[in-house]
């Protein structure tokens, strides 16, 4: 156990709450601040994308000893359900029957705060942090940005306050601090499929449902109460955009024409559409993530990504796993802990940002593409015969804890092989053959 420190975490979201549990485990005094009210006392906002928990997330929760306390609020999704026209195609996720798990962000956040409080962390809600003194880890808080501030000193401060982090904003004022943000021209809006009157599900419960339509798409993830949380991803401007759907008639006509099998299962479509906000999607990168042994960024505050690999929360939780490994290795040397944490984690954060953006293209356009579906079939077939030679990219990202940067590099190599295979004459009918098997092995050995 480390020497006890007085530590502040800014941000009571998923990453901040789990970090609090890990730090309490090491005997530290932990205070968690958030400018928002306690989420346990308020209604959900209608702008949340359901979470897809996978191996990296469970690994971090289990490391804190709380995984089993979360599993009962998660629903296993073993496959994608692809809705194209009136057809429904299923794509199973893992080679060995692995699943990802749907969890409501609000339900999980409430649970994580409860668990952090049980571990001994103290939470302070509706506390606005305006600045932090980097050299002595002093938080400056007050009612307004230009009003009177109160200073509260700590041994160290963690910024877990999201993509638009106040703590990172302070670090950006340093020399040699690199920062970039990139918004997609696509936004998102939450919609809702209620349960049947008897509480049963209107769609297959154990699937992540996708309606791929090129520049826009709809996804739906199951909730415990029989409902689904849907997210419509769509350009802000242009044809088939949020701007073009500006009245009830246009929304209803658009869904009837383009997403006809959703009309009967989303009874409050127009109400949801105009009541719920249209939100932005941003990739944010920065470096360094730490200042001496005093301040560190973690989760979205260090690396916000778009949600198309279902890895935002998983990556944030894995930050904590890596930080905790450094704590075990370097004891009370927080300067080295912080330095090794950011050095180890930055390449993987960049890799999952790239993979998430690419998966947006895959989910919205390629899942309806016959050549792409054939490629996935060939990969699965070969991987099932040679699991030691070929782990598909999705499985490397989702069902392992190997570095994201490794998954990206190997995935790129596998993609070059598959593009060669798809050029072979009559591949559509001759892919399950020894000839193709040997060709893939030959290409693998050419590296």
UniProtKB/Swiss-Prot annotation:
E.C. number: 1.14.13.9
Gene3D superfamilies linked to this entry: FAD/NAD(P)-binding domain
Superkingdom to which the source organism belongs: Bacteria
Pathway recorded for this protein: Cofactor biosynthesis; NAD(+) biosynthesis; quinolinate from L-kynurenine: step 1/3
Reactions performed catalytically: L-kynurenine + NADPH + O2 + H(+) = 3-hydroxy-L-kynurenine + NADP(+) + H2O
Keywords, sorted A to Z: FAD, Flavoprotein, Monooxygenase, NADP, Oxidoreductase, Pyridine nucleotide biosynthesis
Known cofactor(s): FAD
Biological-process GO terms, alphabetical: anthranilate metabolic process; kynurenine metabolic process; L-tryptophan catabolic process; NAD biosynthetic process; quinolinate biosynthetic process
InterPro entries the record matches: FAD-bd, FAD/NAD-bd_sf, Kynurenine_monooxygenase
GO MF assignments: FAD binding; kynurenine 3-monooxygenase activity
The family this protein is said to belong to: Belongs to the aromatic-ring hydroxylase family. KMO subfamily.
Protein role: Catalyzes the hydroxylation of L-kynurenine (L-Kyn) to form 3-hydroxy-L-kynurenine (L-3OHKyn). Required for synthesis of quinolinic acid.
Official protein name in the record: Kynurenine 3-monooxygenase
